[in-house]
Amino acid sequence: MSKKVTETVEQLVTPILNEMGLELVDIEYVKEGKNWFLRVFIDSDDGVDIEQCGVVSEKLSEKLDEVDPIPHNYFLEVSSPGAERPLKNEKDFVKAIGKHVYIKTYEPIAGEKQFEGELTAFDGTTVTLSVKDRGRQKTVAIPYEKVASARLAVIFF
């Protein structure tokens, strides 16, 4: 049911976001404890503010009431993806070039399955990172199809 709910919500929210010049980053429909949460993450090139999240929440709530795809009570949350935004598609990887990222792979690449470093290039088939290895910078090329998950990473100095 979770996949069907997220697909329905995506169909409902996309026109709202397009009208406002925003983009859909992700949708989560999860149970935490006794409560269900429908989380919609939105963004734009300029970021999003609380007013935009509120408008999307109100408009989406109206659509959800009409279609009623969820048979029980739930909490609707609309927010930005935050500082550690997930990279979900090719467009996200292109936008993240020059930024610090964290990537997990399905299988080992050069003996590792987790990488953190600067995303230096993405050509649609290969993600190229500059990572520190024992105090030295090295380049790692990760086949895009081997990426299990990726997100922006915050660097603490």
Swiss-Prot record:
Q: Where in the cell does this protein reside?
A: Cytoplasm
Pfam families of this UniProt entry? DUF150_C, RimP_N
| Gene3D superfamilies, A to Z | Ribosome maturation factor RimP, C-terminal domain (2.30.30.180), RimP-like superfamily, N-terminal (3.30.300.70)
A single GO cellular-component term from the record reads:
cytosol
User: Does the keyword Transport feature in the UniProt annotation?
Assistant: no
Question: Which keywords annotate this record?
Answer: Cytoplasm, Ribosome biogenesis
Swiss-Prot/TrEMBL GO biological process terms: ribosomal small subunit assembly; translation
CDD domains given in the database record: YlxS_C
InterPro entries named among the record's database cross-references:
Ribosome_maturation_RimP, RimP_C, RimP_C_sf, RimP_N, RimP_N_sf
Q: Which family does it belong to?
A: Belongs to the RimP family.
Q: What does this protein do?
A: Required for maturation of 30S ribosomal subunits.
Q: Please give the name of this protein.
A: Ribosome maturation factor RimP
